[in-house]
């Protein structure tokens, strides 16, 4: 019942609203269908890994997100060269390749090279001709003992840097630390422009 000065309860429905009600009765069957599809995909891709190609570890773009790491599109040609894997051979053994990405950090380059070497060490390459296996292909015994990699390939593990606790000094409290970082970024960006301007001014003085 209505109490006080409240509005009278009235369902504001459209005509034929029953036809527009969304139900969720197919949820359990959908779950089973997805599970069956995953099993069929794993069976079809055997002996290749279920997760697909191996992806590199990259950093997100821009100052806002570059502290975060994620899996990228593919390994660079430089990373493949350092790991001793030919660029045309890599996609045939489940290694994603991205010829456009460039290495701007030695740390990332070394991490991805190590990632490639770890993957290559655990890789079992089935020979095309079992009677005449090539040097890099596995033997019949290794092929029979091989198992399909389930789940994520070499999952990305978050590592926390070791922090050293120090006492806050008076110099640290002076000014804005963020402001100092911004000034350093500006100085790095304008370094070439300022050097060119100084060189031009010096040349003008010499001409005079």
Curated annotation (Swiss-Prot):
The entry's keywords: Ribonucleoprotein, Ribosomal protein
Annotated InterPro entries: Ribosomal_eL13, Ribosomal_eL13_CS
Protein name: Large ribosomal subunit protein eL13
GO biological process: translation
Keyword RNA-binding recorded: no
GO cellular component: cytosolic large ribosomal subunit
GO molecular function, a single term: structural constituent of ribosome
One Pfam family per UniProt: Ribosomal_L13e
Species this chain originates from: Chlamydomonas sp. (strain W80)
Lineage: Eukaryota, Viridiplantae, Chlorophyta, core chlorophytes, Chlorophyceae
Disulfide cysteine pairs (residue numbers): none
Family stated for the protein in its record: Belongs to the eukaryotic ribosomal protein eL13 family.
């Amino acid at each position: 019942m209505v109490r006080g000065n409240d509005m009278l309860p009235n369902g504001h429905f459209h005509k034929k609203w029953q036809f527009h009600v969304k139900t969720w009765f197919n949820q359990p069957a959908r779950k089973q269908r997805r599970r069956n599809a995953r099993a069929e995909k794993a069976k079809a891709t055997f002996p290749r890994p279920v997760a697909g190609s191996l992806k590199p570890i990259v950093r997100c773009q821009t100052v806002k997100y570059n502290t975060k790491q994620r899996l990228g599109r593919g390994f660079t040609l430089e990373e493949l060269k350092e790991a001793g894997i030919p660029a045309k051979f890599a996609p045939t053994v489940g290694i994603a390749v991205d010829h456009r990405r460039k290495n701007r950090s030695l740390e990332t380059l070394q991490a991805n090279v190590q990632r490639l070497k770890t993957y290559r060490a655990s890789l079992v390459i089935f020979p095309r001709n079992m009677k005449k296996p090539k040097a890099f292909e596995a033997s019949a015994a290794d092929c029979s003992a091989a198992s399909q990699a389930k789940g994520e390939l070499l999952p990305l593990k978050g590592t926390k840097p070791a922090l050293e606790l120090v006492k806050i000094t008076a110099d640290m409290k002076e000014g804005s630390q963020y402001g100092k970082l911004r000034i350093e970024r500006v100085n790095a960006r304008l370094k070439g422009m300022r050097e060119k301007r100084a060189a031009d001014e010096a040349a003008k003085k010499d001409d005079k």
